[in-house]
């Protein structure tokens, strides 16, 4: 009787927990007696993982927070590596969190354990030398986006493009009328979604700018309505403060970014993963971003890509306008977005084509790739 497969996984944040649980579910269909060890969140635990420690201990953002927790993070990683070497899983899968997981992969591969990294870090854009560490530490890279796979192929890293789970869950056609009815918005009114980011710094830099642009749009289209999904109670309080003294017809939502995107005609949006959601909902957009001047100056010299937004990176052309730093003025944002409220067909046709490329049943693709690496059958 053959020994059940043992799969080790480590996820460091909520998005990784979603990906990990989907992969675990797909693997269980193929091998019902499979065993999972490692670190995950509530979704991965619901699929049968007993997490060595709470995933939240790895969820740190920003240099100051990382430095404050560095001793703990290094100690946890050292203990995790030793535990996994002793357990000898059939494969280790690091899910995103590259600053934590890539080093684990390198040490485990040297110890003779096969390694997979799920979700590429942005090595194609900056710090490209990281690909050398990935090539040394990783038996297989699973990417969510096709241009990432092409990059790894050129660098000699074994890779499989599995598609994006969001493209699987968001339908090819979304229904604006139902979303508007749920929000109490008139069906005939033009609606713009304002999405200035999910972090305090982003909202601080972009919130007032977006509201200035919204006032200019409203002056030209008096019937215009706005929706703004707030990522957290803290962001909602921040947005409410920025709105004081303004007479904008804006509906604030707690979360519900997908509802806002389904309901709107066009989006004014911060560069980031939300632009992919807007693309999948086929909503024409203008992308804006501002950073601290020194940060922007440094990144401009480090980043190798001609584009910053995911829609343009996926299209490999300027599909959506990008207004960055000093170019992101209220006047420029309003002027660029206004025609898209009524006619964004040039963008949305491209969005539909990209959605179909990304819609590949990512969890099942990833499961098949992992089992293929192990020389196992992926028959369901």
From Swiss-Prot:
GO cellular component terms attached to this protein's record: membrane
Reaction(s) the record says it catalyses: a lipid X + a UDP-2-N,3-O-bis[(3R)-3-hydroxyacyl]-alpha-D-glucosamine = a lipid A disaccharide + UDP + H(+)
GO MF annotations, alphabetized: lipid-A-disaccharide synthase activity; phospholipid binding
Alphabetically ordered keywords of this record: Glycosyltransferase, Lipid A biosynthesis, Lipid biosynthesis, Lipid metabolism, Transferase
Example GO BP: lipid A biosynthetic process
EC number(s) on file: 2.4.1.182
Superkingdom in the source lineage: Bacteria
Recorded metabolic or biological pathway in which this protein acts: Bacterial outer membrane biogenesis; LPS lipid A biosynthesis
Family per similarity comment: Belongs to the LpxB family.
Job of this protein: Condensation of UDP-2,3-diacylglucosamine and 2,3-diacylglucosamine-1-phosphate to form lipid A disaccharide, a precursor of lipid A, a phosphorylated glycolipid that anchors the lipopolysaccharide to the outer membrane of the cell.
PANTHER family: LIPID-A-DISACCHARIDE SYNTHASE (PTHR30372), LIPID-A-DISACCHARIDE SYNTHASE, MITOCHONDRIAL-RELATED (PTHR30372:SF4)
HAMAP family: LpxB
Protein name: Lipid-A-disaccharide synthase
């Amino acid at each position: 009787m053959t020994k059940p497969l043992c799969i080790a996984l480590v996820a460091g944040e909520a998005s990784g927990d979603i990906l990990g649980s989907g992969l675990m579910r797909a693997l269980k269909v193929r091998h019902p007696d499979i065993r999972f060890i490692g670190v995950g969140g509530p979704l991965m635990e619901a699929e049968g993982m007993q997490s060595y420690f709470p995933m939240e201990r790895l969820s740190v953002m920003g240099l100051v927070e990382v430095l404050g927790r560095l001793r703990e993070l290094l100690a946890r990683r050292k203990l995790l590596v030793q535990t996994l070497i002793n357990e000898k899983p059939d494969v280790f899968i690091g899910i995103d969190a590259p600053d934590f997981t890539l080093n684990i992969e390198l040490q485990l591969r040297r110890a003779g354990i096969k390694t997979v990294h799920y979700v590429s870090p942005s090595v194609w854009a900056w710090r490209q030398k990281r690909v050398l560490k990935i090539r040394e530490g990783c038996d297989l890279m699973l990417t969510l986006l096709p241009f990432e796979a092409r990059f790894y192929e050129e660098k000699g890293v074994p890779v499989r493009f599995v598609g994006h789970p969001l493209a699987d869950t968001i339908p090819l056609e979304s229904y604006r009328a139902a979303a508007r009815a749920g929000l109490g918005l008139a069906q005939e009114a033009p609606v713009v979604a304002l999405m200035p980011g999910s972090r305090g710094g982003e909202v601080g830099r972009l919130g007032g700018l977006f509201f200035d642009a919204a006032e200019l749009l409203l002056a030209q289209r008096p019937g215009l309505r706005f929706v703004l999904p707030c990522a957290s109670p803290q962001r909602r309080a921040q947005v409410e403060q920025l709105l004081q003294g303004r007479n904008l017809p804006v509906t604030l939502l707690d979360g519900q970014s997908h509802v806002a995107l389904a309901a709107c005609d066009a989006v004014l949006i911060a560069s980031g993963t939300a632009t992919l959601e807007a693309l999948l909902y086929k909503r024409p957009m203008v992308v804006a971003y501002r950073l601290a001047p020194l940060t922007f100056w440094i990144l401009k010299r480090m980043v190798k890509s001609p584009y910053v937004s995911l829609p343009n990176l996926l299209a490999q052309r300027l599909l959506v306008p990008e207004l960055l730093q000093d170019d992101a003025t209220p006047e420029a944002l309003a002027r660029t977005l206004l025609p898209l409220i009524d006619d964004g067909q040039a963008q949305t046709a491209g969005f539909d084509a990209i959605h179909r490329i990304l819609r590949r049943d990512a969890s099942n693709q990833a499961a098949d790739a992992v089992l293929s690496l192990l020389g196992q059958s992926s028959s369901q």
